[in-house]
Amino acid sequence: MPECLPFRYMWRSFWKMLNKSVMNFIGCDAGYEEADIVLYGAPFDSTTSFRPGTRFAGQAVRNDSYGLETYSPYQDRDLEDCRIFDLGDLELAIGDSELVLSEIEKTAETILKDKKLPFMIGGEHLVTLGAVRAAARQYPELHIIHLDAHTDLREDYLGVKLSHAAVIRRCWDILGDGRIHQFGIRSGEKSEFDWARSGHTDFHPFTLDDLPGILPELKGKPVYFTVDLDVLDPSVFPGTGTPEPGGVVFFTLMKNVTEVCASLDIIGCDVNELCPPCDHSGMSTAVACKIIREMLLALKK
């Protein structure tokens, strides 16, 4: 008959658990002042064009992150050794896109001014625009690396310019030609593909194969990194509002995002378009959690 653990050990373990906030992403327990990275959620999906529910992603990944270890054997790094503050989800006015973007912009601007890296969990992809507005104001030479299944380059979607289907076009309005680098794209209108291929963006459709090749030219430049998780194949990641067959597998995405985060001067980033209600198995949320963990660890310089 095995011996029971002494009560003092059981109490020590219980007390440690009580002092961990399960409202945080696992391992993101630093205070704001000491943090190098600030994680925050943007629960917004009002312009979703197909299946809604991305506004639930922030809390889903926080809850399910406790199924992960803080340690990554891929990088031999541990979140326990990082200084990351989890701000929680922002309170956003769901029906007003401009008000939402303004709130995200103010949050990102504050974090950047405090010399910290803002890491946002969407939400639909439109939320990226708020963070990019703040980043471009502080870093006029900003570049964007954009991983996605969709071009997101429409001038408008059904007359709406502030749409997740037009978010990268709105970012282009700020940055102009040559500073947006797109990878994995496999869906969009012909006019979007033609517009991108005419030189407005650095366009690499279908795969991430060309991504390592652009890293040397971006060395030393400020980069905002936006990852729409529907870049993954739906067999790996079905829990998204607009699934698109023909995407990359998990290990390919993980390898590339960690290389980008470790190699470049990433001044802000986001992971978006997880839609937990679209995958009741929880598989997609688990994938999102692991991608976020690997990005956070790779950002630790």
Predicted stretch roles:
Residues 16-301:
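Conserved alpha-helical scaffold segments that buttress catalytic/binding sites
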